[in-house]
């Protein structure tokens, strides 16, 4: 996931690190020049108490810069209005970006209280900027003369900034602006409350097992990890499982004790919906109402209409069109998978009744039966070190870039950092990794930046990028972290986001972003390499003796790539539809979230009760605590793009083809928002203007289509004829996304 900074409200703010000359503030590292290697944040000196005064000082400085732009008596120009805006807010961006990154990865009660205080402060500050009539008049004056701007990036930035002002309410009446300010302030606070509640509920639950019989079925490595978790909590003689994915998913997959699987899954499923202080139901209702109020103030019938107006999809109807065309084929395949699992369950127990907490357990039995593959036998070849080196080797083969470990300040002892060097050995940026789950860290995985690439005085200012994950810890204190397939693929995914930031070649920070439904293309295209046989031969080595992964295991991975894809796709589509459903409401009435979800998914669309949406509303942090509101469909949308783009590598005859990689880098990864995604760019492999879900399903070369050899509509899972494969990829590969059910996110 691409982590959206809270400063997305003003993408024109520059993230360079300049010193404050106020002597009374010099003890605050956030207000000093960062004389650290590569200008990284001095994490070793930053304390929670530094943030509020630094942000208050940043707001004061930013206001002074805005006043200077407004009071300038010269004729409004790109330089004295648009560029000045893009360069403004440096101190504030410095402080608040650092705060946001730390609050997601290394939070505590003090940081959460600060977030509640700072979020409405930041919201009010940017409202005061965007709703400043005198400032907007200057922006509009430059915008009205934009055809006279000859530099393409300057013209594009002018258009983007004008659009941001309009979408922020610059054309509203004074009364409407005051109402909008109140709405934005409330929304900023509610989003923080939602996230804090979710973190509290995630941390509150533990399953403590004191009877070894209850561990039956669990691999030794999982048992050892649970025992280590207990010892870390000062508890001996027990095993502790938590709701973090490296603990939850293996338990659901392997534990023979059905009652305990049910207990674990219900604890996950019912987060933030117990009617206590962490219940998010009222918060979600308030958010939905306020978002609708905001949309109507700005002239839109629904919040989804407002949100999608600036995206590739343009309208909720277009997003629905893709999801709806994929829904029935995915659901039909999931039903087929269910029947296979029910048959196994009946053969073993005499009972084919099936619940949602049975899916992982019996799906694993299907995988073992059909493909003779146990994911635990893959872990020794997927050590964290090997996977990371594989990603680095792939990047070197595609673009010639290299990664050098560096010693820089970090916010947690487990973090590591690398300098990224281009093929000419020039500095591209700094890349942090934070791999493991811990209390105070949000679940899932994401990529963020504390500094976006831009140019200053003709010189590129390199970005600072961070990848945060929650992969399996080493089972013992001095052990090696051994990943499963999903965790390995997650790192490839987030690394794709990192490359998007590291390769950026835009002059202005306001051009650093792209459309929400385009942003997942760089991440999802990287997933395609993760388990290519040629790629596995490069990095999948046994952690103890360095032996390469046996060819029969590589073949099993390839053959089992069809495994469980009906489920995976259906629960992803269900979450995407839930997001759109609640944000296309045009008249608000109090919502019973559970009832609304069942009506829209189970009753209207036929979702079977054994499958829950990937995220239910009370813990759907992407849309209520993050930047994906009415935008979760973007993962499916970008999947359409990524399969077409990756096919360019396949058709070259070499998935490591350097010319194709350089073209992809130049035309996609470097360009930022220099063009809108719907504008023509010189990269022919992104069919974002002609997305047709049904034809995509039936078309060869994409994820869901009819097998040319056996005519199976949804993939030849039975025949497995070797002739049905080409270039190490299955002809009728099924599944919109390969990640396992809970994928990459919280």
How would you name each of these model-derived features?
Residues 702, 721-731:
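Intrinsic-disorder-associated, low-complexity terminal segments enriched in Asp/Asn/His/Tyr and depleted
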Residues 23-50, 57, 238, 369, ...:
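C-terminal, non-catalytic "cap/extension" segments appended to globular domains
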Residues 16-19:
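C-terminal motif of bacterial Sec signal peptides marking the signal peptidase cleavage site
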Residues 472-491:
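Short pre-active-site segment immediately N-terminal to the catalytic Zn-binding motif
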């Amino acid at each position: 996931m691409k982590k959206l900074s809270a400063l997305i409200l003003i993408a024109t703010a520059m993230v360079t690190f300049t010193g404050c000359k106020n002597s009374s503030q010099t003890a605050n590292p956030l207000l000093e020049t960062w004389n650290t290697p590569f200008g990284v944040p001095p994490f070793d000196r930053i304390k929670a108490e530094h943030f509020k005064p630094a942000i208050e000082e940043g707001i004061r400085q930013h206001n002074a810069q805005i006043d200077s732009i407004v009071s300038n008596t010269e004729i409004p120009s790109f330089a004295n209005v648009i560029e000045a805006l893009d360069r403004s807010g440096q101190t504030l961006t410095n402080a608040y970006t650092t705060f946001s990154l730390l609050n997601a990865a290394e939070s505590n009660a003090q940081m959460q209280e600060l977030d509640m205080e700072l979020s409405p402060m930041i919201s009010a500050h940017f409202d005061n900027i965007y709703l400043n009539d005198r400032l907007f008049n200057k922006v509009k004056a430059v915008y009205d003369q934009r055809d006279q701007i000859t530099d393409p990036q300057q013209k594009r930035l002018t258009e983007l900034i004008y659009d941001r002002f309009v979408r922020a309410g610059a054309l509203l009446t004074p009364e409407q602006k005051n109402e909008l300010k109140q709405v934005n302030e409330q929304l900023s606070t509610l989003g923080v409350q939602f996230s804090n509640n979710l973190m509290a509920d995630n941390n509150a639950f533990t399953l403590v097992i004191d009877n070894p019989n209850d561990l039956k079925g669990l691999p030794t490595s999982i048992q050892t990890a649970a025992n280590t978790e207990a010892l870390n909590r000062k508890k001996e003689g027990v095993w502790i499982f938590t709701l973090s994915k490296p603990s939850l998913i293996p338990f659901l997959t392997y534990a023979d004790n059905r009652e305990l699987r049910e207990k674990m899954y219900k604890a996950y499923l019912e987060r933030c919906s117990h009617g206590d202080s962490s219940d998010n139901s009222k918060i979600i209702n308030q958010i939905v109402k306020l978002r609708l109020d905001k949309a109507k103030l700005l002239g839109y019938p629904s919040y989804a209409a407002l949100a999608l107006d600036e995206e590739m999809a343009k309208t909720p109807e277009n997003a629905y069109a893709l999801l709806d065309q994929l829904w029935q084929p995915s659901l039909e395949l999931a039903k087929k998978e269910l029947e296979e699992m029910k048959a196994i369950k009946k053969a073993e127990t005499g009972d084919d009744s099936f619940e949602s907490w049975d899916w992982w357990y019996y799906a694993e039995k299907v995988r073992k039966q059909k493909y003779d593959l146990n994911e635990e036998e893959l872990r020794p070849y997927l050590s964290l070190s090997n996977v990371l080196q594989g990603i680095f080797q792939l990047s070197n083969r595609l673009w010639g870039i290299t990664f050098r470990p560096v010693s820089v300040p970090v916010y947690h002892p487990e973090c590591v950092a690398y300098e990224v060097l281009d093929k000419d050995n020039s500095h591209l940026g700094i890349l942090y990794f934070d791999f493991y789950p811990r209390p105070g860290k949000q679940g899932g995985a994401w990529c963020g930046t504390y500094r976006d690439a831009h140019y200053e005085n003709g010189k590129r200012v390199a970005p600072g990028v961070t990848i945060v994950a929650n992969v399996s810890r080493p089972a013992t204190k001095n052990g090696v972290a051994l990943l499963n397939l999903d965790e390995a693929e997650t790192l490839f995914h987030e690394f794709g986001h990192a490359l998007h930031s590291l390769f950026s070649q835009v002059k202005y920070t306001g051009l650093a972003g792209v459309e929400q439904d385009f942003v997942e293309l760089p991440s999802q295209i990287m997933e395609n390499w993760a388990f290519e046989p040629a790629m596995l031969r490069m990095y999948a080595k046994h952690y103890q003796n360095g032996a390469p992964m046996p060819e029969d295991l590589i073949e099993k991975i390839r053959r089992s790539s069809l495994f469980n894809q009906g489920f995976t796709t259906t629960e992803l589509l269900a979450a995407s539809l839930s997001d759109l459903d609640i944000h296309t409401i045009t008249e608000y009435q109090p919502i019973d979230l559970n009832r609304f979800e069942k009506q829209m998914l189970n009753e209207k669309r036929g979702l079977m009760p054994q499958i829950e949406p990937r995220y239910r509303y009370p813990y759907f942090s992407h849309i209520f605590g993050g930047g994906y509101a009415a935008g979760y469909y973007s993962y499916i949308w970008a999947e359409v793009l990524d399969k077409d783009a990756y096919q360019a590598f396949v058709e070259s005859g070499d998935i490591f083809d350097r010319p194709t990689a350089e073209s992809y880098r130049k035309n996609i990864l470097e360009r930022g928002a220099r063009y809108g995604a719907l504008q023509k760019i010189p990269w022919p492999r992104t069919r974002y203007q002609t997305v047709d879900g049904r034809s995509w399903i039936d078309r060869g070369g994409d994820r869901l289509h009819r097998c040319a050899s056996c005519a199976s509509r949804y993939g030849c899972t039975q025949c497995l004829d070797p002739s049905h494969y080409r270039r190490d990829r299955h002809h009728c590969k099924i599944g919109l996304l390969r990640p396992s059910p809970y994928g990459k996110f919280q």
